């Protein structure tokens, strides 16, 4: 077999592969055997008809077609391996020439990973938020917990941020009512600022059964930019009453008997949460700094596939209804052109990161254990709200299991490289990166399990 490689761009090549018939004996034997099993020729048992009769009865065409189909995958892989090509995506294959009993020549255009030099992570320096837990942080966490047990009660005082109002709203442009911006009996939390611009300001200071009127500018939709008159009537005003943070609350909201025990546990949880946030910040900042050190062309077809996948996911959530997508974009104040541009930008960032991490993984050569892969599969299934067994079956049927393996490999490679970077917090203190990304040796792991 002879192969030539033509570089079409930094990210795409064309292989021309010439395979002599002398190397196709196995495929030819298999093709005749397969067709002999499918046909009945008088005087011969099924599968025993000689080649000459098969050629005479059906011609050489079906044999050659079968031979080509059988040999293409293995010969393509052989050509890729022999030329040390780092291909990504599926190839576009064409049969260029076929001379019976002589040779088969095919071409394959395929994207390849661009070449670039991975930066030295030991020369990367980043800053991340300091790991500090204040009493205010603990107070806020306890208040958030208490809010889950809060009750809405009527209030006669003037409303303020955080209160709830049951309201009627009428929005008009040039005297014409806008149904999409008019509501009756709607419950609204003052401070959310997610309905009509100026509504929060208008509601502050109002009481039950009062009316108010204000002008605003429509932010999206058909009347975007138009001045509108908004009339609001408060049916009811309510405030959220939170339980007292005492021992009784601790017993109701947790497994603890006293508020002091609950507070101490809450502090521990806040500290762990801040550690997770710091670890995520380290990962993001180091990766961002590393990516800024390299420049390479992206394979357009891979980016296109990513854009298509993102659109397919969004449309799947909307039952593939283009009208529903248009309504969603209108509600968000976004055009289809802006949506497509954002999708392409996101796809480019994703592909760029994956290609970089693949190159890093080749250098770091991390090993992925079966347990690590299983843990990642379980975590991913959980994030999708799927049964793990069904998720695995779906991965196997769509040949996507290798993608999750690559995800784990990329993550381990990045974790190893991050440990070489210099990380300080905003207070100027050096951060112990190993506590987040360092490997635990087997002795430590066993000791931890025994405890």
Swiss-Prot record:
Disulphides: none
Subcellular location: Cytoplasm
PROSITE patterns: FKBP_PPIASE (PS50059)
GO terms, molecular function: peptidyl-prolyl cis-trans isomerase activity; protein folding chaperone; ribosome binding
EC category name: isomerase
GO cellular component, as recorded: cytoplasm
UniProt record, GO biological process: 'de novo' cotranslational protein folding; cell division; chaperone-mediated protein folding; protein transport; protein unfolding
Domain PPIase FKBP-type: 162-243
Broad class of where this protein is predominantly found: cytoplasm
Function recorded in the entry: Involved in protein export. Acts as a chaperone by maintaining the newly synthesized protein in an open conformation. Functions as a peptidyl-prolyl cis-trans isomerase.
Entry's free-text remark on domains: Consists of 3 domains; the N-terminus binds the ribosome, the middle domain has PPIase activity, while the C-terminus has intrinsic chaperone activity on its own.
Family: Belongs to the FKBP-type PPIase family. Tig subfamily.
PANTHER family: TRIGGER FACTOR CHAPERONE AND PEPTIDYL-PROLYL CIS/TRANS ISOMERASE (PTHR30560), TRIGGER FACTOR-LIKE PROTEIN TIG, CHLOROPLASTIC (PTHR30560:SF3)
HAMAP family: Trigger_factor_Tig (MF_00303)
Protein name: Trigger factor
Organism annotation: Corynebacterium aurimucosum (strain ATCC 700975 / DSM 44827 / CIP 107346 / CN-1)
Lineage: Bacteria, Bacillati, Actinomycetota, Actinomycetes, Mycobacteriales
């Amino acid at each position: 077999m002879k192969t030539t490689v033509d570089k079409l761009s930094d990210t795409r090549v064309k292989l021309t592969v010439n395979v002599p018939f002398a190397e196709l004996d196995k495929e030819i034997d298999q093709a005749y055997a397969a067709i002999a099993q499918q046909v009945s020729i008088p005087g011969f048992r099924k599968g025993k008809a000689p080649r000459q009769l098969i050629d005479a009865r059906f011609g050489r065409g079906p044999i050659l077609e079968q031979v080509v189909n059988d040999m293409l995958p293995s010969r393509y892989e052989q050509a890729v391996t022999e030329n040390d090509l780092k291909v990504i995506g599926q190839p576009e294959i064409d049969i260029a020439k076929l001379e019976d009993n002589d040779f088969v020549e095919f071409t394959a255009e395929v994207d390849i990973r661009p070449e670039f030099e991975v930066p030295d992570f030991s020369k990367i320096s980043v800053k991340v938020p300091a790991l500090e837990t204040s009493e205010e942080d603990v107070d806020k966490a306890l208040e958030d917990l208490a809010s889950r047990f809060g009750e809405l009660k009527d209030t006669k005082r003037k409303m303020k941020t955080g209160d709830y109002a049951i309201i009627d709203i009428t929005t008009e442009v040039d005297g014409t009512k806008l149904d999409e911006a008019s509501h009756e009996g709607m419950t609204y939390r003052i401070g959310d600022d997610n309905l009509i611009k100026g509504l929060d300001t208008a509601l502050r200071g109002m009481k039950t059964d009062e009316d108010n009127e204000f002008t605003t500018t429509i932010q999206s939709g058909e009347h975007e930019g138009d001045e509108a008159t908004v009339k609001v009537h408060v049916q009811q005003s309510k405030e959220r009453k939170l339980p007292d943070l005492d021992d009784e609350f601790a017993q109701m909201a947790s497994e603890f008997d006293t508020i002091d025990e609950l507070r101490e546990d809450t502090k521990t949880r806040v500290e762990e949460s801040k550690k997770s946030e710091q670890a995520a910040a380290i990962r993001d900042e180091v990766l961002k700094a590393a990516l800024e050190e390299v420049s390479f062309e992206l394979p357009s077809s891979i980016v296109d596939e990513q854009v298509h996948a993102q659109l397919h996911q969004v449309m799947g959530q909307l039952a593939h209804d283009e009208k529903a997508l248009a309504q969603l974009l209108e509600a968000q104040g976004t055009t289809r052109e802006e949506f497509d541009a954002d999708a392409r930008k996101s796809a480019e960032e994703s592909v760029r990161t994956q290609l970089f991490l693949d190159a890093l993984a080749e250098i770091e050569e991390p090993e992925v254990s079966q347990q690590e892969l299983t843990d990642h599969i379980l975590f991913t299934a959980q994030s999708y709200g799927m049964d793990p067994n069904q998720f695995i079956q779906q991965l196997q049927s769509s040949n996507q299991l290798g993608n999750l393996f690559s995800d784990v490999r990329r993550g381990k490679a990045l974790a190893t490289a991050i440990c070489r970077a210099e990380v300080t917090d905003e207070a100027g203190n050096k951060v112990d990166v190993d506590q987040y990304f360092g490997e635990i040796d087997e002795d430590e792991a066993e000791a931890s399990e025994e405890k």
